[in-house]
Curated annotation (Swiss-Prot):
<keyword id="KW-0699">rRNA-binding</keyword>
<dbReference type="InterPro" id="IPR005727">
    <property type="entry name" value="Ribosomal_uL22_bac/chlpt-type"/>
</dbReference>
<dbReference type="InterPro" id="IPR047867">
    <property type="entry name" value="Ribosomal_uL22_bac/org-type"/>
</dbReference>
<comment type="subunit">
    <text>Part of the 50S ribosomal subunit.</text>
</comment>
<dbReference type="GO" id="GO:0022625">
    <property type="term" value="C:cytosolic large ribosomal subunit"/>
</dbReference>
<dbReference type="GO" id="GO:0019843">
    <property type="term" value="F:rRNA binding"/>
</dbReference>
<comment type="function">
    <text>This protein binds specifically to 23S rRNA; its binding is stimulated by other ribosomal proteins, e.g. L4, L17, and L20. It is important during the early stages of 50S assembly. It makes multiple contacts with different domains of the 23S rRNA in the assembled 50S subunit and ribosome.</text>
</comment>
<comment type="similarity">
    <text>Belongs to the universal ribosomal protein uL22 family.</text>
</comment>
<dbReference type="Pfam" id="PF00237">
    <property type="entry name" value="Ribosomal_L22"/>
</dbReference>
<keyword id="KW-0694">RNA-binding</keyword>
<keyword id="KW-0689">Ribosomal protein</keyword>
<keyword id="KW-0687">Ribonucleoprotein</keyword>
<comment type="function">
    <text>The globular domain of the protein is located near the polypeptide exit tunnel on the outside of the subunit, while an extended beta-hairpin is found that lines the wall of the exit tunnel in the center of the 70S ribosome.</text>
</comment>
<dbReference type="InterPro" id="IPR001063">
    <property type="entry name" value="Ribosomal_uL22"/>
</dbReference>
<dbReference type="GO" id="GO:0006412">
    <property type="term" value="P:translation"/>
</dbReference>
<protein>
    <recommendedName>
        <fullName>Large ribosomal subunit protein uL22</fullName>
    </recommendedName>
</protein>
<dbReference type="GO" id="GO:0003735">
    <property type="term" value="F:structural constituent of ribosome"/>
</dbReference>
Length: 126
Protein backbone atom coordinates (compact mmCIF):
# COMPACT_ATOMS: atom_id res chain seq x y z
CA UNK A 1 0.00 0.00 0.00
CA UNK A 2 2.45 2.67 -1.01
CA UNK A 3 6.13 2.90 -0.59
CA UNK A 4 7.81 2.50 2.74
CA UNK A 5 10.23 5.23 3.68
CA UNK A 6 13.89 4.38 3.84
CA UNK A 7 15.50 4.73 7.25
CA UNK A 8 17.94 7.61 7.61
CA UNK A 9 21.51 6.68 6.85
CA UNK A 10 22.82 9.11 9.44
CA UNK A 11 21.77 9.58 13.06
CA UNK A 12 19.08 12.03 14.17
CA UNK A 13 21.67 14.54 15.37
CA UNK A 14 23.63 14.45 12.10
CA UNK A 15 23.39 15.91 8.62
CA UNK A 16 25.54 15.40 5.57
CA UNK A 17 26.41 16.80 2.18
CA UNK A 18 28.11 15.08 -0.71
CA UNK A 19 30.00 16.55 -3.65
CA UNK A 20 30.82 14.38 -6.63
CA UNK A 21 33.00 14.79 -9.69
CA UNK A 22 35.58 17.09 -8.10
CA UNK A 23 38.41 17.62 -10.56
CA UNK A 24 41.32 16.83 -8.28
CA UNK A 25 43.05 13.72 -7.05
CA UNK A 26 41.75 12.02 -3.90
CA UNK A 27 45.18 12.42 -2.29
CA UNK A 28 45.14 16.22 -2.67
CA UNK A 29 41.50 16.46 -1.56
CA UNK A 30 42.21 14.35 1.52
CA UNK A 31 44.81 16.89 2.68
CA UNK A 32 42.08 19.55 2.86
CA UNK A 33 39.50 17.14 4.36
CA UNK A 34 41.95 16.25 7.14
CA UNK A 35 42.22 19.96 7.92
CA UNK A 36 38.57 20.15 9.07
CA UNK A 37 37.92 16.73 10.62
CA UNK A 38 36.77 16.93 14.25
CA UNK A 39 36.61 20.73 14.37
CA UNK A 40 33.70 23.01 15.17
CA UNK A 41 32.10 24.31 11.99
CA UNK A 42 33.01 27.96 12.63
CA UNK A 43 36.67 27.03 13.00
CA UNK A 44 36.54 24.72 9.98
CA UNK A 45 35.01 27.47 7.81
CA UNK A 46 37.72 29.90 8.92
CA UNK A 47 40.46 27.37 8.15
CA UNK A 48 39.04 26.74 4.68
CA UNK A 49 38.65 30.47 4.00
CA UNK A 50 42.36 31.09 4.51
CA UNK A 51 43.67 27.83 3.09
CA UNK A 52 45.96 28.27 0.09
CA UNK A 53 44.85 25.02 -1.56
CA UNK A 54 42.82 25.49 -4.75
CA UNK A 55 40.26 22.86 -3.80
CA UNK A 56 39.43 24.41 -0.42
CA UNK A 57 36.77 26.65 -2.02
CA UNK A 58 34.75 23.62 -3.12
CA UNK A 59 35.22 21.92 0.26
CA UNK A 60 33.96 25.10 1.93
CA UNK A 61 30.85 25.11 -0.28
CA UNK A 62 30.16 21.49 0.66
CA UNK A 63 30.58 22.24 4.37
CA UNK A 64 28.19 25.20 4.06
CA UNK A 65 25.71 22.87 2.34
CA UNK A 66 25.98 20.36 5.20
CA UNK A 67 25.37 23.17 7.72
CA UNK A 68 22.32 24.35 5.75
CA UNK A 69 21.01 20.76 5.60
CA UNK A 70 21.41 20.46 9.37
CA UNK A 71 19.53 23.68 10.01
CA UNK A 72 16.75 23.49 7.41
CA UNK A 73 16.13 19.77 6.95
CA UNK A 74 16.89 18.40 10.42
CA UNK A 75 16.33 21.38 12.73
CA UNK A 76 19.75 21.24 14.37
CA UNK A 77 21.41 24.15 16.16
CA UNK A 78 24.23 25.43 13.95
CA UNK A 79 26.18 26.88 16.87
CA UNK A 80 26.83 23.43 18.31
CA UNK A 81 27.80 21.60 15.11
CA UNK A 82 31.06 19.69 14.74
CA UNK A 83 32.50 18.11 11.58
CA UNK A 84 32.31 14.49 12.67
CA UNK A 85 33.36 12.95 9.34
CA UNK A 86 34.97 14.22 6.16
CA UNK A 87 35.96 11.43 3.84
CA UNK A 88 37.15 11.24 0.28
CA UNK A 89 36.49 8.66 -2.40
CA UNK A 90 37.78 7.95 -5.88
CA UNK A 91 35.68 8.73 -8.92
CA UNK A 92 36.42 8.30 -12.61
CA UNK A 93 39.80 8.91 -14.20
CA UNK A 94 39.87 10.64 -17.60
CA UNK A 95 42.62 9.24 -19.77
CA UNK A 96 44.35 11.52 -22.23
CA UNK A 97 47.22 11.16 -24.67
CA UNK A 98 50.27 13.38 -25.12
CA UNK A 99 52.36 13.09 -28.26
CA UNK A 100 56.05 12.60 -27.58
CA UNK A 101 59.16 12.43 -29.70
CA UNK A 102 59.83 9.73 -32.31
CA UNK A 103 56.17 8.84 -32.75
CA UNK A 104 55.67 7.74 -29.20
CA UNK A 105 52.86 8.68 -26.86
CA UNK A 106 52.45 9.20 -23.14
CA UNK A 107 49.42 8.62 -21.00
CA UNK A 108 47.94 11.53 -18.99
CA UNK A 109 45.58 10.64 -16.14
CA UNK A 110 43.10 13.26 -14.93
CA UNK A 111 41.54 11.91 -11.72
CA UNK A 112 38.22 12.94 -10.18
CA UNK A 113 37.18 12.60 -6.53
CA UNK A 114 34.11 12.79 -4.35
CA UNK A 115 33.73 14.26 -0.88
CA UNK A 116 31.25 13.51 1.91
CA UNK A 117 30.99 15.75 4.97
CA UNK A 118 28.93 14.75 8.02
CA UNK A 119 28.22 17.32 10.73
CA UNK A 120 26.98 16.33 14.19
CA UNK A 121 25.25 18.34 16.90
CA UNK A 122 27.01 18.00 20.25
CA UNK A 123 25.94 19.23 23.66
CA UNK A 124 28.48 21.63 25.06
CA UNK A 125 29.57 20.92 28.62
CA UNK A 126 28.96 24.05 30.70
Amino acid sequence: MGQSTNPRRVADNEARAKLRMIRTSPQKLNLVAALIRGKKVERALADLEFSRKRISKEVKKTLESAIANAENNHGLDIDSLVVSEAFVGKNLVMKRFRARARGRGAKILKPFSELTIVVREVEEAA
